[in-house]
Amino acid sequence: MEYFDNRIIRTTIFVFVVALILRTGYSYFFIDPEYLILEDQGGYVQLGQSIAKTGDFFQLTDGKHTGRLPGYPTFLAIIYTLFGENNMAVVVVQTIIDSLTCVVIGLIAKSVIPRSFLVVGMISALNLNMIIHSGMILTDTLFLFLFSIFILFAFYYLRHPARLKLFLAISFLAIATLVRPVSYFLIMLVLLLLIVRFILKRIQLKEIMYNI
């Protein structure tokens, strides 16, 4: 109940709605569908369409090899399967995801500084970089969403340790790594930090194995 009282629910809805309105407005007035296949975006679109049609993950021009990770193309393939090969549908889904990210970032701030949810959530909602990237077929929006959830559950675990919170934190970090490799080395860092925490807390080996 700590995380879901009425005030937090109202703030969550407010931040989400403001973020969604801003991102929807940007997408409606400033995004040309033809722009969504330019440069790196075209490569992701091609991979997503290929997965949706064949179920195989490879670049059509290079045989069964790819310089991309499978997370984001699979995300695109799911959208193409559900809504057809409509790149604006991708933008719509990403505007929703990015609006949720603003809420998650606000919750992260709240776990560190009480009463900061609204301020930090609104800063995220108004963040021009986030707004622009939500309207591009690139990994940024999906990765930030997944990585933010990892941080949120990591903070929740540190405050009130529970195996489910640890499992969710590690799972979202692993999924985020399938979207962008930048978080790959954090997996080992997280394990190291957990060990340090257990040592500082003087937790016995039996309890460490139980938590892990």
Q: Which role fits each region the language model picked out?
A:
Residues 29-42, 53-74, 80-88:
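Membrane-proximal lumenal/periplasmic loop motifs of glycosylation machinery
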Residues 105-126, 144-145, 160-168:
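Transmembrane-helix signature of polytopic, membrane-embedded enzymes
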